Amino acid sequence: MARSKIALIGAGQIGGTLAHLAGLKELGDVVLFDIVDGVPQGKALDIAESAPVDGFDAKYSGASDYSAIAGADVVIVTAGVPRKPGMSRDDLIGINLKVMEAVGAGIKEHAPDAFVICITNPLDAMVWALQKFSGLPTNKVVGMAGVLDSARFRHFLAEEFGVSVEDVTAFVLGGHGDDMVPLTRYSTVAGVPLTDLVKLGWTTQEKLDAMVERTRKGGGEIVNLLKTGSAFYAPAASAIAMAESYLRDKKRVLPCAAYLDGQYGIDGLYVGVPVVIGENGVERVLEVTFNDDEKAMFEKSVNSVKGLIEACKSVNDKLA
């Protein structure tokens, strides 16, 4: 049986980490693509030479021509400019929209049957634009956001409670920006809701609120520390979890930027919601009920996404 083919568009920090993780998890053969000739080829060779040590069998290649991604089962898009200190995700729109147009055309021509995961920021706008430019079905194009944001929240919670991250579940919905919505009511430690843990004295509401705020600013915290780039280990791990659920038909429930056509009262936008990812891509959207505060936060987040979409339309009239 032929191995799956994974195409990685963008061979920067996230792209290289994705390529390595795909090999370690034996998800399939990997093609690294980048417009800077030599970089994808060099990283592909470097990772391939680690395979005998780590004991995984996967073919690696690097390319600067979109024809190399032909027939890919999964395409993960990281191409674009990362955030620098002082930049918001939204500052990247003008630059990265042009990148999405080129990437969308490449996918449309060479990998129209792929499951596409977008990581490029500002995420909710870029995944929307990528779907438009590629013309792929909306259930086969998804954005990596909530898995990462939820992982950050889980890490902070596990540290606070002194428990294993495996026993912490966390839910972060909405847009992948400062208005994201970490839902404490749906987040648990070994099944016990965070709201109950406050009552039990495990933490205080103030500490919980601080962790929520730190989660919202999680990407910016790393940007400010690195000074020359943005996060790449956790974003790559998050996208690989999504790819694995698709390739192995695991049907995991993962918070992702998914296309909504009526769910949550939203039509025609990509917004972070819990979805089931299986062999057909996004197979179901899980609609959770909000209390009044959560509903207000979610609507604020959705309005931020709408603003990004309008900005995209004003920059590129093909999207209008």
Swiss-Prot record:
Residues binding NAD(+): G10, A11, G12, Q13, I14, G15, D34, N96, I119, T120, N121
GO terms assigned for molecular function: L-lactate dehydrogenase activity; L-malate dehydrogenase (NAD+) activity
EC number(s) stated in the UniProt entry for this protein: 1.1.1.37
Enzyme class per UniProt: oxidoreductase
Pfam families: Ldh_1_C (PF02866), Ldh_1_N (PF00056)
Organism of provenance: Methylorubrum extorquens (strain ATCC 14718 / DSM 1338 / JCM 2805 / NCIMB 9133 / AM1)
Keywords, in A-Z order: NAD, Oxidoreductase, Tricarboxylic acid cycle
One GO biological process term: lactate metabolic process
Protein name (record): Malate dehydrogenase
Family that this chain belongs to: Belongs to the LDH/MDH superfamily. MDH type 3 family.
Record has RNA-binding as a keyword: no
Function: Catalyzes the reversible oxidation of malate to oxaloacetate.
Residues where substrate binds: R83, R89, N121, R152
InterPro entries: L-lactate/malate_DH, Lactate/malate_DH_C, Lactate/malate_DH_N, Lactate_DH/Glyco_Ohase_4_C, Malate_DH_type3, NAD(P)-bd_dom_sf
